[in-house]
Amino acid sequence: MRAVHFGAGNIGRGFIGSLLAASGYDVVFVDVNEQIVRLLKERGEYRVIIAGERQEEQWVRGVSALNSQTERDDVIEAIASADLVTTAVGPHILPVIAPVIAAGLERRFTVHQKPLHVIACENMIGGTETLKQHVVTHLSEAGRQLVEECVGFLNCAVDRIVPNQTNDDPLAVTVEPFFEWAIETKNTIGAVPPIQGAHFVADLGPYIERKLFTVNTGHALAAYLGYQKQYRTVQEAMKDSGIRESVEQALRESGAVLVKKHGWDEQEHRSYIETTIGRFTNPSLSDDIVRVARSPIRKLGPNDRLVAPAVQYYTLFERVPSGLVKGIAALLLFDETGDAEATALQQTIEQSGVEGALVQYAGLDNSHPLVVAVKEEYKKMQKEQ
């Protein structure tokens, strides 16, 4: 079996590529990083370090690589003969790789029409559907018809902490032990692709929301509260008992929303929260706070990790969620000068106040009780700075 994987970065090598290789695929990485592509070609293997209580090493073998800029024709041929195509490139790169994927599919259809699955493993909702929309704009009319018949674009949710890192060996990558790869089956063509460690689900929605309202919510709180106390990493911040309690409180609140909405077992979800807290406190990882906190305007969005669970909590329980409110207030104080969104956010607050920022970016009415609560918490945090 052959898998073509776009994105030979840390997530591509340390998560998706390693699982595909373990599942029996010959993995062809596609990237524009000349050094990484050259080393993967030369060695055909790389090392993954699992940073748990005890450090483990795994060797990923039987891999190769292509440069999508200088070896475009080879990438097209690889797609034409692939059994699976996956990506881990970042949402903004999906439209960039769409033309070569489309060309590969057109070439494939001239040779055979065997089923193919495409899975975009991106930190976004509906990533594969988004990729499909970009791909079809580059297909012929006949190609579009054959895509509907022969290619299954499967949405997925992925979760593994792969921190920023610098290794002596450019191919080596450190990852946390935990991972989750949930793949939605509704667009499957024939049998689901064999992927060791992935689980296939009929409805991805609850899995995406569970991750967003737990992992992303908790991560954001630790980062924004940690930034206020000038901690460098999430792991350092989580050693602060006050920050840890605030994170746990917020996850109890978002957890109450999830349990109520989806009818989940409360104890099972509590266990998931405990696992998540354990991931944030893993001493073998170093999660840079500024990296986790970046893009605060996006993270303040009405459907994102802080405002969405806070609004739903208030709607369901008619109480203000104090932990989530703390997280939103801390986000509004994030003023990292190297972050364009942080700069824009601070300018909005200066011009329109906290209420103006929450109306503009979070989609809240300025009379909403959450706005009042966040404003109070914001003032309190300002005094403590």
From Swiss-Prot:
What would be an example GO MF term here?
A: mannitol-1-phosphate 5-dehydrogenase activity
Instruction: Give the highest taxon in the source lineage.
Output: Bacteria
* Record-linked InterPro entries: 6-PGluconate_DH-like_C_sf, 6PGD_dom2, Mannitol_1_phos_5_DH, Mannitol_DH, Mannitol_DH_C, Mannitol_DH_CS, Mannitol_DH_N, NAD(P)-bd_dom_sf
Tell me which Gene3D superfamilies the record gives: N-(1-d-carboxylethyl)-l-norvaline Dehydrogenase, domain 2 (1.10.1040.10), NAD(P)-binding Rossmann-like Domain (3.40.50.720)
Which residues make up the binding site for NAD(+)? 3-14
| Cross-referenced SUPFAM superfamilies | 6-phosphogluconate dehydrogenase C-terminal domain-like (SSF48179), NAD(P)-binding Rossmann-fold domains (SSF51735)
Q: Which GO terms describe its cellular component?
A: cytosol
Query: What keywords is this UniProt entry annotated with?
Result: NAD, Oxidoreductase
UniProt signal peptide: none
Q: What is its EC number?
A: 1.1.1.17
Which top EC class is given?
Answer: oxidoreductase
Q: Which reaction does it catalyse?
A: D-mannitol 1-phosphate + NAD(+) = beta-D-fructose 6-phosphate + NADH + H(+)
Does this UniProt record's set of keywords contain Membrane? no
Q: Where are the transmembrane segments?
A: none
Q: Name one GO biological process term.
A: mannitol catabolic process
Instruction: Tell me the protein family, please.
Output: Belongs to the mannitol dehydrogenase family.
Which HAMAP family does this one have? Mannitol_dehydrog
- The name on file for this protein is Mannitol-1-phosphate 5-dehydrogenase
Q: Which organism is it from?
A: Geobacillus thermodenitrificans (strain NG80-2)
